[in-house]
Structure formats: structure tokens, C-alpha cells
């Protein structure tokens, strides 16, 4: 049996609780995926996989369902500590080819910075598999132009959640996820 997902949606959430596990559960609830048994997989965006809205994606989920995902997750109970989770996405111009998803879970990075970093990771992984020539020492903005001008990478984006650690020391958890559907 071969299972290649045909649909994908992206979600994110944040949760705060005195218990670590409960803060994760609340982040899953905020992301609207708490009812699934999540199985994390590596970072390939399947060929010809259609991105759908979270509202459409949720219609395909049932309580207890085994659900494949790529997830970035981060937690802290340090007051005011900045945390983030980000999924970067890079898609090839040829939809019959696979793309890349990257996970990034930093401390001390803003949502914007973490998102750009995750997007850069995914785009760089895709560029290397497509044989695009680039200087890895240049800034992301410059490489993004090179990637897109090559005509081989059509789109890149990120889905990022950030939060500051709770001021009272509660556990704070952030998640970002790509949910893969049949």
C-alpha cells in the first residue's frame, strides 16, 4: 500500500498551563488539531499535493484519526522568554516534483525572523535538489531572488507561531504544523 498525501493544510497555536503536557494540549486545541493522533514525518511536500484552507482541512479529520504531520514545537516556563515554531515551505515550478517543508523551533527569535529562517531552509534544500547555483553566504533575500528567477522554484512561504513565556512562569508552548491528508 502506497500512501502519498493529496491535500495539505497549515495551522499554528499557542497554549499556556502550569503543566508542560497541558500547555501542549492547549496549543493543539488553539491549532484545532487536538482530536487527532498525530504522527510526525520528515519534510517532503508531496508532488501534486493541493494546499487547502484550515476550514476545509478540518472537515477531513475525525476524532482519534491517525494523522500525519510535519510539526515544529517549542516550550518554556521561563518568564518572558521568546519562543517560536515555524514551518518553512518551498514548492517547485513543476508540480509533479516534490517540494520541501522545514521545521524550526528557536529561542529568542521573533516570528518574522524565525519564519524567514524556516523558509530559507526549505528553499535551500529544494534548490540543492534542483541543481540551482547559488552562494550560500548571501542573505536570504538575495538567494530568494536567485531561486525564483531560476524558474525552478515557484513559491516559498512560512507558517510561524511565537510567544513570550508566561509572566507567572506557566508553561508556554507554540506549535506550527503541516497536516497531510489522503
Swiss-Prot record:
Biological process annotations from GO: arginine catabolic process
Catalytic activity: L-arginine + H(+) = agmatine + CO2
Site, as annotated: Cleavage (non-hydrolytic): 42-43
First-tier enzyme category under EC: lyase
Listed GO MF terms: arginine decarboxylase activity
Enzyme Commission number(s): 4.1.1.19
Name of the protein in its database record: Probable pyruvoyl-dependent arginine decarboxylase
Source organism (scientific name): Chloroherpeton thalassium (strain ATCC 35110 / GB-78)
Taxonomic path: Bacteria, Pseudomonadati, Chlorobiota, Chlorobiia, Chlorobiales
